[in-house]
């Protein structure tokens, strides 16, 4: 997404939690290096820390002088079937995926100048398209994002700010083992995985002036993927 937005002329700030990003061990998973490559502003942040989301928005405003667009694609997700749920894991999902987004949007709204168009793009998942019985805490947190997207869109529309959420579907970022990769691929009608670039194209469009009349929407960018496909 950062590559696409930079290519399309946006001035971009990237953030991440270095300790967590390093644990994931995914290819291309170093946002600081990516920021340096793209000439973007890199500002690490812990969105679970007190004041973390507010400080992140303040850093963007200080660096750029204003903040027009917020793309919030951070997430926390673990395997949480019914028999393995515990309060700590539920709280972690809600803190990262719900509370942090609420505070980011609140801080954005406070910092966004009157009379300037604005864009907020949040990320959800496919929980409304079929059961996610092995990811109960994650599914609950992403369902909250869909609800909040609609409320935020109503609250911010008078100020010219659109708010939408994307369900990117399964993206081939290196996380899936070979068996999972094959199972998921067969459930895409096109028999290929989605890619980060597929999602990035939609993000960039939603951030553009052309999407000024699109708000309060939950948009599936998932290539028709369904667990029911075979």
Tell where the protein language model's regions lie, with residue ranges.
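Short-chain dehydrogenase/reductase
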Residues: 1-64, 77-80
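Conserved NAD(P)H cofactor-binding loop of Rossmann-fold oxidoreductase domains
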Residues: 73-79, 224
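Substrate-binding pocket helix/loop in short-chain dehydrogenase/reductase
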Residues: 81-82, 89-94, 184
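Active-site helix of classical SDR
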Residues: 105, 141, 149
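Alpha-helical segment proximal to the catalytic Tyr-Lys
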Residues: 110, 154-155, 212
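Short C-terminal tail/terminal secondary-structure segment
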Residues: 130, 204, 215-230
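Short, small/polar-rich loop/turn modules that mediate ligand/substrate recognition or access, typified
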Residues: 157, 162, 214-216
């Amino acid at each position: 997404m950062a590559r696409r937005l930079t290519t399309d002329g946006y001035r971009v700030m990237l953030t991440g939690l270095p300790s967590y990003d390093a644990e994931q061990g995914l290819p291309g998973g170093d946002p600081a290096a990516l920021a340096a490559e793209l000439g973007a502003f890199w500002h690490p942040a812990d969105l679970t820390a007190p004041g973390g989301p507010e400080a992140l928005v303040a850093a963007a405003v200080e660096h750029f002088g204003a903040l027009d667009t917020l793309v919030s694609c951070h997430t926390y997700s673990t395997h949480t079937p019914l028999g393995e749920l515990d309060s700590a894991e539920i709280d972690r999902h809600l803190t990262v995926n719900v509370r942090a987004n609420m505070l980011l949007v609140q801080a954005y709204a406070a910092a966004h100048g009157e009379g300037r168009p604005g864009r907020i793009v949040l990320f959800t998942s496919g929980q409304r398209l079929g059961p996610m019985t092995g990811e109960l805490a994650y599914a609950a947190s992403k369902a909250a994002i869909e609800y909040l997207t609609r409320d935020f869109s109503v609250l911010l529309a008078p100020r010219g700010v659109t708010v939408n959420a994307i369900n990117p579907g399964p993206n081939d970022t290196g996380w899936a083992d070979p068996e999972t990769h094959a199972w998921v691929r067969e459930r895409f009608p096109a028999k290929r995985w989605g890619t980060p670039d597929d999602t990035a194209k939609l993000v960039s469009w939603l951030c553009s002036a052309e999407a000024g009349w699109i708000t309060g929407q939950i948009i599936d960018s998932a290539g028709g993927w369904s667990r029911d496909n075979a």
